[in-house]
Amino acid sequence: MIKITLPDGSIKEFENGVTPMDVAKSISEGLARNVISAAFNNITVEISTELTTDGSLVLYTWNDKDGKKAFWHSTSHVMAQVLEEMYPGLKLTLGPAIDNGFYYDVDFGDTKIVEADFKKIESRILEISKEKHEFKLRPVTKADALELYKDNEYKFELISNLEDGTITFCDHATFTDLCRGGHIPNTGIIKAVKIMSIAGAYWRGDEKNKQLTRVYGTSFPKQKDLTDYLELLEEAKRRDHRKLGKELELFAFSQKVGQGLPLWLPKGAALRDRLEQFLKKAQKKGGYEQVVTPHIGQKELYVTSGHYAKYGADSFQPISTPTEGEEFLLKPMNCPHHCEIYNVRPWSYKDLPKRYAEFGTVYRYEQSGELHGLTRVRGFTQDDAHIFCTPDQLDEEFKKVIDLVLYVFGSLGFENFTAQISLRDKENRDKYIGSDENWEKAENAIINAARDKNLNTVVEYGEAAFYGPKLDFMVKDALGRSWQLGTIQVDYNLPERFELTYKGSDDQLHRPVMIHRAPFGSMERFIAILLEHTAGNFPLWLMPEQAIILCLSDKYEIYAKKVLNLLENHEIRALIDNRNESIGRKIRDAEMQKTPFMLIVGEEEEKNNTISIRRHGQEGKGNITVTIEEFARIVNDEISKTLKTFEV
């Protein structure tokens, strides 16, 4: 008999050779009908795999992330089979599951895949699916594997780097592929498929290697799931931050300035400034001190911090001074600079914690093919802060940072999120620096803080940084997509590298603990996500322009200026549209700019010292006429519902 531990902690005994499917049947028939994959002792296995030792078992359905991963990986095998049939002579390379689907990188040789072929590929995949071919994993010797793929230099290279005894093939129908495993039971579960696109991709991601063709696809267990997904993609196109950024005149890019270097236009700069002032105000209440550091630093600074060794390939080339022979780097991180600020003077335990905050611009070299709007850029500004505290202060400081992150999310309409607690892999302690005692303190601080703040959490072992555990906030946007926003990290590494100290109550020198935190992450990426989440309808307090005054004709321009002055006295951001256009055109343009309030002024309004309000997106609901003071109350009441005061 063997003992199987289930996710709820219960332990069941089974005959040696039991399969995950057998375990599912012992739990419920419903689970047995829906289980498609499993993990045994944290290793993905098929549900037909015979289990011969004690261990922990997790069963996955389509609703689980790992279930989808197995589903999409299996579909990539079927697509590879079809591509091999349709394009004789091609060479398959790698075909993993990715977010929302899968891809396969292919060397098509002298042939070429075109979009017109997609429907044929989809139809053939579904034909094979209906035949319900089982996915079967089998071990092979390295010699046999190399023999099979002697004419495919890509698979040959992969196999050459594997150890004998670890190589497996996956068979279904007449198709065989090199694979480690993680498949659904059979092709019959695949009911809907869509080939999404093709793109160029270098072998193993190295631009020095041959460029292959990457074929992207997705699949689902129901046709309705695919239909819903495609509708979601259409909505995502409408919300694309690159499209909205151009339409709303927020930011632009210039080839002369350089790829991945956004230019913030007046309205976009105003939006950024509002976000910065919002966070600075909260940080001031939270005891943070603003600092400013240069855009460059000596290479030696980043060698000391370890960033150059780890991220040197992602940094721009060093800048050498003409005469002194010094080497500088465009700043890839703010934290080394903040360590040097801490080191300017000696500290006592009575002085701690020290909280340094900065909107610091950093630079990373991203390959041109990886750049994407504001989400992947080469220059970006982080809302960085670093807290230097004693080990005894760690718990309380961590909770305070969580409070700040929750305040930011609540003020900006991000209500659906999960906190991922990333801990070390205790089986591989050599991967991490610092004592077991410090690690346990830090991990417990994060776990306890998340519990005390009633966060919805998931725990990921082995996902901690080498220098300390962390808490990542995974936010779902209006389209149900998950984004990592807001990170809090505990760091024992940099205080050691920079020899940071404070004098304790025992008059001895001690190392402080360092906390990295960035609620936004980067201003560029955060604004991109916020744009797509809100479709450009930002919270009223954040809008660059909260109202626009529309004159029925130019003879009401003097009154419009009077209205503008009164609005400014109430700290309402507005402007006047006095163009020689029809009122209908002015309204349409204001709607396109997503201006929250259109204030129409004409003869009646001037006579009665009023304005006629039209709300964005409420066509056909009629206008209401109010005084300026009444309108100011409407605006302030709406803002007060979303923008609360940060309570320490």
Swiss-Prot record:
Its cofactor is Zn(2+). It is an enzyme of class 6 (ligase). Its main location: cytoplasm. Residues 240-539 are annotated as: Catalytic. It comes from the Bacteria. It catalyses: tRNA(Thr) + L-threonine + ATP = L-threonyl-tRNA(Thr) + AMP + diphosphate + H(+). One of its GO terms (biological process) is threonyl-tRNA aminoacylation. Catalyzes the attachment of threonine to tRNA(Thr) in a two-step reaction: L-threonine is first activated by ATP to form Thr-AMP and then transferred to the acceptor end of tRNA(Thr). Also edits incorrectly charged L-seryl-tRNA(Thr). This is Threonine--tRNA ligase.
